[in-house]
A protein has these predicted regions:
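Short, polar/acidic, helix-capping and beta-turn segments at strand->helix junctions
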Residues: 1-94
Length: 94
């Protein structure tokens, strides 16, 4: 989720997306992983048509070169006050 330190959503969609990717990066680092270790991404969007360009820009920053992870985008009606959520599957080394 693109939540701020207090757990609330950023009011701007682009900020929510950036915070979600920043939060994800922090979780990956804590696990000894990086964006290169992600093999599957699922994102949830409250208005996919209006939001997709912003998400694609964040995707390009996070995954600048091949191989890209599998990516599924899902339109939803409600995300508990948020407009974007990201879920990933990560491959960790033994």
């Amino acid at each position: 989720m693109g939540s701020r330190e207090d757990g609330s959503p950023a009011p701007d969609f682009a900020d929510q997306v950036q915070l979600a990717f920043d939060n994800l990066e922090n979780v990956l680092k804590a696990a000894g992983a990086s964006f290169d270790d992600i093999i599957d991404v699922t994102t949830f969007h409250t208005d996919p048509d209006a939001q997709f360009e912003t998400v694609l820009a964040a995707k390009a920053r996070a995954f600048p070169q091949k191989p890209y992870p599998n990516w599924t985008a899902v339109g939803v009606n409600w995300l508990a006050g948020f407009d974007f959520e990201i879920k990933v599957i990560v491959r960790l080394a033994d």
